[in-house]
Amino acid sequence: MSPLDVHVNRSPIAGKITRMEHRTGKGKRRGPFLPAFRKESEYNERVRTLFQREDGLIVEVMQISGALARTIIPWTSEGDDMRRGERFGMIRLGSRVDVRVPAAKFEPCIISAEDGDKNHPKGEFVKAGSTIIYRGI
């Protein structure tokens, strides 16, 4: 995401937040932080959130801060029940969000903002709460 994008994050499924883990960034005075799209951003601040559906399916969302503001703001806590598409937090300015689902149960509709295909050209924006990024098999 660029600093000009909307940085609100939404629940990928309806379910309960079963775990939230916050890790501060490594380095001097909360830095140096790297752009979230770089591999080395593994040292940036991050919040890992696990959502669990009633049938037991677990989806992981990793919010990773970027090089500018470096602040993740969670609006939820472990034990909260979420609706699909409900807001659960935000990342200030440049950032990245990874969504991990069981590969045996889902197929991606959008691989990456960097990968283009005939249905989703490179650089296409995700629309808040409505773009489907994976489908059940």
Annotated model-derived regions:
Residues 1-137:
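Contiguous, well-folded functional domains in the mature portion of proteins
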